[in-house]
Amino acid sequence: MKEKVVLAYSGGLDTSITIHWLKENYNLDVIACCVNVGQDEDFDEIKKKAIKSGATKIYVEDVKDEFVSEYIYKGVKANAVYEGKYLLGTSFARPLIAKKLVEVAHKEGAKYICHGCTGKGNDQVRFEVGIMSLDPSIKVIAPWRIWNIKSREDAVDYANANGIEVPVTKEKIYSRDQNLWHISHEGGDLENIRNEHKTDMYCMTVPPEKAKDEVSYIKITFEKGEAKKLDDVEMSPVEILEKLNKIGGENGIGVIDLLENRLVGMKSRGVYETPGGTILYAAHKELEYLTMQKETFHFKQMVSQKYGELVYNGLWFSTLKESLDAFIDKTQEVVNGTVRLKLYKGNIMVAGMESPNALYEESISSFGASDFYDHKDAEGFINLFGLPYKINAMIQLKNQEN
C-alpha cells in the first residue's frame, strides 16, 4: 500500500500542478485538503478538479467561523499590524490551515504534508513552523524548493504540457490569496515598483475615486474588544465581517500598496484589499482611546507591534504569542461600547462614541469650571514635571559662565 501525503490544495496554479508532480516523483497517494477560510471559490468544482488532477481523496474543511472568532478577532484585539500598514490577511489564515492539514494527516495516517509555497515567500515558513509546532514527526514536501520550475511562467508551461487546467495565463500572472479578511495581489507588473498598480485588479473594493458619492454611517458595538453588533443588530463574527466587507468595498475602503520586508530577507510588493478589516481596526482602536488608561494604552502599542511581527513570521503557536494573548485579553475587559463611523471615498472618520467604561469625563475635560480640577494645581505639577530640565539648564549656564 502506498504512503500518503496531505496536500494543501487550492485549485490554483501551484497546487494544481503539484498533484501530478507528487505522483510522478514520489509515488504517493495524494490526499488533497482545501481549507475554506472565506475565499470566493466554487468548492464543488475544486473537489472535481482535485480528483481529475489525480488526488485519491479531497477534504474541504469549512473553518470560516473559527477563522474569524479565534484568529482574526485575536488580531483585532491586539491591533496587530505589520510595518504600520499590513493587516496580516494571509498571516492570520496560515496557522489555521496548518492546523487542519495536521488533523487530516492524523485522520488519514499520512506521514507527509505538502504545500505549494514558493521558496522565496513567507508562507513556506508559516506552514512549516506551524506544522512542526503541532506535530514534529510529520515530514514536509516543498516542491518549489526541489523541482526545476523556477517561475510562474514555467508553472503555466508545465500545466499546459500535462493537460492541467489552471485559472492563470502568462498575460494575467498575478498571484492572489483570498480569504474572508482580505485579498492580496502579487507578481506581474507589480514587480516593477515604477508602475502604478492597476485598479482593475480589485476584487473586494472599488477605487476611492469611483466610490459612491453618498456618505455611509455605521455603528459597531464591542464587548471585551470583540465586535458583537452592527447598527444595533447582533450578528455572528462572520456575518459582521461579511457586512463590513460589502460596506467598505462600496466606499473604497482598505486598499494598500505595500513594499514589505519579507521574513526571508527580501523586499516584496503587494496590493492588499481589506475593506471590512480596515473598518473594524479603526473602530476598535477608537474605543481603546476612550476606555484605556494612558500607561496601558501606550504599552499595548508596543505589544501590538511585536504581536504583528510574531503573526507575520508564522509564530502563532509560540509561547510568546500565547502569553501576549493573555495580556491583551486583560486589557480588553474595558473595551466595551459603540463607535459610530462615517465612510466616504476611502476615508474613515469617527462620528461619535459611547462606553460604560469611558475614561473621558466632559465636566473634567471641559475648559469651563470643574469641581475635580483646580487650575492652580497645574503650577505645582509643571514645576515638578519640569524640574529635571530646569536643573539641566542651570548647570549648562553655569558651565558656560566658567
Curated annotation (Swiss-Prot):
Principal subcellular localisation of the protein: cytoplasm
Pfam entry (one): Arginosuc_syn_C
Record Gene3D superfamilies: Argininosuccinate synthetase, chain A, domain 2, HUPs, Single helix bin
Enzyme Commission identifier(s): 6.3.4.5
InterPro entries linked to this entry: Arginosuc_syn_C, Arginosuc_syn_N, Arginosuc_synth, Arginosuc_synth_CS, Arginosuc_synth_type_1_subfam, AS_cat/multimer_dom_body, Rossmann-like_a/b/a_fold
Gene Ontology molecular function, alphabetical: argininosuccinate synthase activity; ATP binding
Pathway assigned to this chain's UniProt record: Amino-acid biosynthesis; L-arginine biosynthesis; L-arginine from L-ornithine and carbamoyl phosphate: step 2/3
Catalytic activity, as annotated: L-citrulline + L-aspartate + ATP = 2-(N(omega)-L-arginino)succinate + AMP + diphosphate + H(+)
Family matches, as NCBIfam families: argG, PRK00509.1
Record-given protein name: Argininosuccinate synthase
Organism: Clostridium novyi (strain NT)
